[in-house]
Amino acid sequence: MNLQKFPRYPLTFGPTPIQPLKRLSAHLGGKVELYAKRDDCNSGLAFGGNKTRKLEYLIPDALAQGCDTLVSIGGIQSNQTRQVAAVAAHLGMKCVLVQENWVNYHDAVYDRVGNIQMSRMMGADVRLVPDGFDIGFRKSWEDALADVRARGGKPYAIPAGCSDHPLGGLGFVGFAEEVRAQEAELGFKFDYVVVCSVTGSTQAGMVVGFAADGRADRVIGIDASAKPAQTREQILRIARNTADRVELGRDIASGDVVLDERFGGPEYGLPNEGTLEAIRLCAKLEGVLTDPVYEGKSMHGMIEKVRLGEFPAGSKVLYAHLGGVPALNAYSFLFRDG
């Protein structure tokens, strides 16, 4: 496998820490050891997160092409668009963000706080569009790219989640290589890695990275899209493309993509009672915050899998914390009593 042939623009602090979740593990019976890899703490650029790790591989391509404007898309409380805005500000580039109405949630300040507030503060051209949720390419995004060109700019297209991009899976191949180095220091290997999946390139990159030592199917995706068939197809497609690019040396089979569909409801961006319980439990036991859209759902999935005995006793499970906490302010009514 050859990730090193791809240029990488450093936007993160370096390897993200692995933190034992001792109190949560004990609360769930102590038979499974839970850890978190804190990609939510990976950068000084507007709170960072998993997209910042991905952007390290997209930015060299943007600069090599002489682009002057980063153009991306997400929901109103998109972590992706906030991280793209931060990177654009850091590099002195322009930024156009298409923010669609992906979440059926209504709050008086939903479009004025959290991620979208930060994007505006960092100088991004934020464009609100009423279209609903979908992980595919969007006409509103293509229109924004055309608008930048019409105005004489040179846009760089960054799809939702950095995912359906030729280089979108590379960052989390690097995540797997980083984990292997940390495992050597810790003196043990993780039996499972739990990760939230929506647009797919985070899990896809992990699948490829961990396939290098036979652990592709130990990456347990927790669907948060509530459209798992579409998400699964995109994970597999991105993983296969990424495997070819990094010269993995083996095919990615459909069985290498494990996606648990039980925790994504009721729909994208809306938590269920299990999501909210998991958010509160992790906060109170560990002081670790998760959000209602992504990490709360993957935390719920991990907790339930422990409770149901789906991880064998003695397993060491690594939870990939991808970020998302800036969106909590937009859901303040849900947590008005804690």
UniProtKB/Swiss-Prot annotation:
Keywords: Hydrolase, Pyridoxal phosphate. The active site is at S78 (nucleophile). InterPro entries: ACCD_DCysDesulf, ACP_carboxylate_deaminase, ACP_carboxylate_deaminase_bac, TrpB-like_PALP, TrpB-like_PALP_sf. Its cofactor is pyridoxal 5'-phosphate. One of its GO terms (biological process) is amine catabolic process. Its EC number is 3.5.99.7. Homotrimer. Belongs to the ACC deaminase/D-cysteine desulfhydrase family. PANTHER family: 1-AMINOCYCLOPROPANE-1-CARBOXYLATE DEAMINASE-RELATED. This is 1-aminocyclopropane-1-carboxylate deaminase. The gene is acdS.
